[in-house]
C-alpha cells in the first residue's frame, strides 16, 4: 500500500467587509468536497483559509460604523465562521490576514524580493483628499462626466453614457469620502518586477498546474507583455507597513495570498505533526493546491507564483479554477430575490441539498454554474430522496420486523455487488479530477440499479407469501449493503447524511476502503427518516426573504398607464436635428479580445474588429461582465468616429453602446444576427 499523500489546500480568502452568499459558497463547497474525499481515502489533507482583512474599504466602513477596523473584522469573521460551519465546510484552520503570522511572512517575502533586486520605486501622481489626508482610488472620486455632463459619476467611467476617462478629466471632482475637492499629489510607490519572471511563468503555467483553458488565457497575457505591479499604498491604510518605509503599506493583494501561508503557520503552532517548511520550503515534495474563481486568476497564476519564486519558496502544485454562479439563468439580483446570502439559505433549507446540487453540476472546467430553482427541487427530491434514501427506507422495516434488525449473511446478487465494486475506481478518479458531476452521475446510476433490483424482487409482495421470509431478508439485506456503498461514495458531498446513516447502520465512520466489504449477520439500529423532500414553497420563501424592499416611485402609479419608470429615472435629452445625429458614425463591431485593466476598478479593454481595421476601446462595464473573455466573439455596436481619448491606461478609440442604470445592470447592445463587422448602423 502506498504512503498517504501530504496535501495542503486553500480556498480564496473572503473579504472581511460583507456577508457570504451562495456564489461564494460554490467555491468553499467544491473545495471542501475535494478535501473530504482525500481524507476519506486516508491521505493527510489540510484545508486552511482566512478572512482577507485589509484595505481602504474596511478602514472606511469601520469609521462609518464608529468602530475600529479590528472590531469590524472580528465581527465579520464570527459571521463567516458560522456560515461556513453550518454549510459543513470543515476547515482545519480559519484565520485572518490581520495576524502576527501574516505580518511576519509578508515582511519576509518583501525583504527577500527587495534584496534580490525585484522591487522598484517610482513617483505616481494621484488625487489626494486634503481633509481625510489620503490618496483616493478611482472609486472614491466622483464628479461630472466630461462627455455627457451627468453628475455624481465615478473617477474612471460614466455609468450614464458609458464614457471612460482618466480621473483628471472628471469635471468638478469631489472626494466620495469627505465631499471635498481633491488635489493632485505625487507619491513614491513600490513595484514588484513581474516582467523579470516572464520565462519562469511561461514554463510554470504550461507545466500542468492549470486547466488548459486557464493556461491559454494566461498565455495571452504573457504574450502581450507583463507590467510591473504596484504593491504599495499610502497612509492612512488598514494593513501592514512596508519594512523600513514609514507611511507606506502593502497593497491588500500582496499580503492576501500570503494569508494562506499565515493560516497554515498558525495551525502548525498547534499541530506538532505539521512542519511549515515541508509544505512551503523550496523543493518541498508535499502537494499544494489553490481553489479560486476565474476572476482572480491573474493574481494566483502570475503574481503569486512569481513572488514565491523570487522569495525562494515553493510554487503551487495546481490552481483549480471555477466559473461563476448564476441563478435561474441570470446574474444574481437582489430585486429578483436571487442574490442569496448563505445565512438566508440556511434559514430555509438544509445545507446538503445545495452541496449535492453543486456537486451534480460541477465539472473540472471553468464554465459558469446555474442554480435553477425548479431543477434544484427536482434533482434533490429525485436523486437523494427518491433514489438513495429510498433504498434504506424500503428495506429497513422488513429486516427489523422479520429478523429483529439483524442483516442476513448471504449475498443475494453477487453480480450487482461486483458492479458496485467495479465502479469505485472510476468514481474515485472523477473526485480526484474535481469532476464532481461525473462522480454523482456514476453514483446515481448505481442507485438506479439498486432500486431496479429491489423493485424487481418486490420484498413487500414476497413478505405476504408463506415461506418467502428468507428471501425477503436476503433481498433487503443486500439493499442495505448497496445503500451503504452509495453512502460511502457520497460521503465527501453529504457528510451529515453519512453520519446519520452510520448511526442507522451501527458502524464506525465509513472510509473509502469500506466499499470493498459487505455487512453480514449485522445488527442495525432502528431506522428514522434520513432526508425529507424539498417543499417548493420553502424555495419561494427563501427568494422572497432575499429581495430588497422596493420603494414606490409614484404615489399615483396604480392609476397611471402601465410603464416601467425608466424615463422618470432618466429623462429624455434635449432634441437634436438630423444633421447632428447623422454626424455620429455607428458601426457593428466584433469583440476580438476583452480583458481586465490592471489598476482600474470599472474598466475593460476591448479589441474591436470593425471590418478593415481594429480599434482599442476602454469601457466601464467591468461590474456587469466580471469574466470579460465571455464577450469575445460577440457582435456589439460602437461610435466609430469619436475622437480618440488619452487615458492613463492607453488610448480609447471609440465607445461601445450599452443600456442600464449601472453596476451589475449594464447590458451591452448587440445587432441582430446576420450583421457584419464594419457595417454602418442607420
UniProtKB/Swiss-Prot annotation:
It is an enzyme of class 6 (ligase). CDD domains: Anticodon_Ia_Met, MetRS_core, tRNA_bind_EcMetRS_like. A motif ('HIGH' region) lies at residues 14-24. Binds 1 zinc ion per subunit. It is found in: Cytoplasm. A motif ('KMSKS' region) lies at residues 331-335. One of its GO terms (cellular component) is cytosol. Keywords: Aminoacyl-tRNA synthetase, ATP-binding, Cytoplasm, Ligase, Metal-binding, Nucleotide-binding, Protein biosynthesis, RNA-binding, tRNA-binding, Zinc. Its cofactor is Zn(2+). One of its GO terms (biological process) is methionyl-tRNA aminoacylation. ATP binds at residue 334. Zn(2+) binds at residues 145, 148, 158, 161. One of its GO terms (molecular function) is ATP binding. Its main location: cytoplasm. Its EC number is 6.1.1.10. Is required not only for elongation of protein synthesis but also for the initiation of all mRNA translation through initiator tRNA(fMet) aminoacylation. This is Methionine--tRNA ligase. It comes from Pseudomonas savastanoi pv. phaseolicola (strain 1448A / Race 6) (Pseudomonas syringae pv. phaseolicola (strain 1448A / Race 6)). The gene is metG.
